[in-house]
Regions:
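Cysteine-cluster motifs in flexible loop/terminal segments that predominantly coordinate metals
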Residues: 331-347, 519-525, 551-554, 558
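Short, well-ordered coil/turn residues that connect adjacent beta-strands
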Residues: 517, 531-532, 545-546
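Generic detector of short, aliphatic-rich beta-strand segments that form the cores of beta-sheets
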Residues: 338, 506-509, 558-565
Length: 574
């Protein structure tokens, strides 16, 4: 059963989309003159219909029509594409505050709710055979895995029986379905769930997670978050994340989850809600694979080849609870200010993400927008100063507004306009008197943490000669790899390379020095070690030698050795 075998058609008699096998159902497709309407669809709920009504000045009967949305953000109403662009319309919208009030004032009637249920019940009934294949098919895919979710889950559990099964739960529709599938397939409600709370989720995501825990009290549920860092304050220090330098996930999601899971001695079999159709990068994922992101490292993806429409077919068929952000029109649920979000998601966040007595979010869209303007002012101003371009205050203000409006902050890289970027400058020079020796000046005094950073290379041996200390790093054969000479409370160090067989050794050492210079204890490094040897807790960077296997993944994982240093690096002007 391959993706190309299936198509999404419009069933005029029932006024809903149906998923059909192009070969097996060819007679029906021809006899009923069914038209393939989209590569994928999602249902449009009443709340989003209300938004469309206000945005496009539609008639009141929109609430009672069968409305669906394509992956490209095009709406299909009763089988007919709406010939209006939502992106263009929101960009041309006048008086946003008034529009927002109209959207938030919506109240559903019983008649509207009954009609919505009727549409979805027809959708479920007409697609039940397709859902049965998704759940129970024992055909094998090109990887040799069962196509049906239930036999796939059962087989994977049997194959990795010594591992602890776990569901990675994000609060989105895909992980909601995977959670339900796994617990149902195994007839076991006590499957461990872990939620990586980035502290940046949509308000309704938090409400849904609380409902999930309340309704599934037999399911052990871990909420993991970075308690030591504040996203908003980090943005002020190192700039907002961008599509080029998306530092936030490692710091606020995989880092905290890695910290918790590394404390377990068991290895995990993690069930993910990842799907190949979500992005070009995910299209290359395997259904079962190893991952360094989670301690123990095997992940299984039961819905990896499902459409969006398949996910919704399961949710509506099983009548399971889901994140109500989807009702508002969010095509995907995640961090509400993510630089990878679409214009539509950004627009919806501007409507729905605001502080009030009903949520506990750390900051809202208005505060985020104000920050973006102040940050962008520094970036734009510094760019013009560097290039000797003189602007009046009015001209500068205009360029800043354009920078924010066109989302240029999403494409930024480097620490232009940020004081912290100076910490990425490592002053170094080659020693004339000694071969393979370099003198470097740090921006911090050498301390115990400095020594800790070299434990991944091998055994540490320190010799003291008065105020001077010599740090030798030895390999497993007790042979010296390199030597670092420094004085107590000094910022100057001298590095001598002893083992010249590794031509990348000096670069690896520099990576650790970058880490020492710029470390803000963000906890991103916690996710780099699959053996639980590394931990950043309470403002301390620690490595447990008894667990470290000297794989150097913690050294090589991030560009420049440090996620923060990488985010702050400013390209030198040629």
């Amino acid at each position: 059963m391959l993706e190309k075998d299936w198509g999404i058609y419009w069933d005029n008699s029932n006024n809903i989309p149906i998923i059909l096998n192009k070969d097996l159902e060819s007679i029906r497709i021809k006899s009923e003159s069914l038209l393939e309407i989209a590569q994928d669809l999602r249902p449009v709920f009443l709340e989003e219909k209300h938004l469309l009504k206000k945005l496009f000045q539609l008639e009141d009967d929109i609430y009672f029509k069968s409305v669906w949305c394509t992956k490209q953000g095009r709406y299909i109403i009763d089988g007919v594409p709406l010939k209006k662009s939502i992106v263009r319309t929101i960009n041309e919208l006048q008086n946003f505050d008034e529009f927002r009030v109209e959207v938030l004032s919506f109240t559903k009637t019983d008649e509207m709710i009954q009609q919505e249920e009727s549409i979805f019940n027809k959708f479920v009934e007409e697609n039940k055979n397709h859902l049965n294949l998704l759940l129970n098919s024992k055909e094998r895919d090109r990887e040799g895995q069962y196509i049906g979710a239930y036999p796939f889950i059962e087989e994977v559990i049997e194959k990795y029986s010594k591992r602890v099964p776990m569901v990675s739960f994000s609060g989105g529709k895909d992980s909601t379905v995977v959670s339900h599938l796994v617990r149902k397939a195994l007839n076991n409600q006590s499957i461990l769930h872990i939620f990586g709370d980035t502290t940046l989720e949509l308000p309704l995501t938090y409400k849904y997670v609380e409902r999930f825990k309340e309704e599934n009290q037999m399911t052990p549920f871990f909420d993991e978050r970075n308690e030591e860092n504040n996203f908003f304050e980090m943005c002020k220090e190192i700039g907002p994340p961008s599509r080029v330098k998306s530092w936030c996930c490692s710091i606020f999601k995989t880092g905290p989850m890695g910290t918790t899971l590394s404390n377990f001695e068991e290895n995990f079999l993690t069930f993910y809600g990842v799907r190949r159709k979500e992005s070009a990068s995910r299209s290359k994922y395997s259904k079962v694979s190893k991952t360094p992101k989670i301690h123990g490292g095997i992940v299984a993806s039961p819905v990896i080849d499902w459409y969006d429409l398949d996910i919704w077919l399961y949710i509506l068929s099983e009548k399971i609870d889901f994140n109500e952000s989807y009702r508002q029109g969010f095509p995907r649920v995640g961090c509400w200010m993510c630089p990878n979000n679409s214009d539509i998601s950004q627009f919806l966040a501007k409507i729905y993400v605001s502080r009030n007595e009903y949520n506990e979010i750390n900051f809202d869209y208005k505060e985020w927008e104000d920050f973006l303007y102040s940050f962008s002012y520094k970036v734009v101003n510094e760019y013009h100063l560097k290039n000797n371009i003189i602007l009046t205050e009015k001209e500068l203000e205009k360029k800043v507004k354009e920078y924010v409006k066109k989302n240029k902050w999403k494409a930024r890289q480097g620490g232009d306009g940020l004081e912290k970027s100076k910490d990425t400058i490592l002053q170094k020079k080659e020693c004339i008197n000694e071969k393979n020796t370099y003198i470097l000046n740090l921006n911090r005094e050498v301390d115990e943490e400095f020594i800790t950073l070299f434990k991944p290379f091998g055994e540490i041996l320190i010799q003291t000669k008065g105020k001077i200390q010599e740090l030798f790093v030895l390999n497993r054969k007790k042979e010296a790899l390199f030597k670092i000479v420094f004085k107590d409370k000094s910022k100057e160090i001298k590095i001598t390379l002893i083992d010249l067989s590794d031509r990348y050794l000096y670069g690896k050492i520099i990576r650790q020095l970058n880490k020492f210079n710029t470390c803000i204890y963000c906890q991103a490094c916690n996710s780099t070690c699959s053996f639980g040897a590394l931990s950043v807790i309470n403002g301390r960077y620690m490595i447990d030698e008894s667990k470290c296997v000297n794989c150097l993944n913690c050294v090589n994982k991030f560009d420049m050795g440090c996620l923060v240093a990488s985010a702050l690096r400013v390209k030198s002007k040629e």
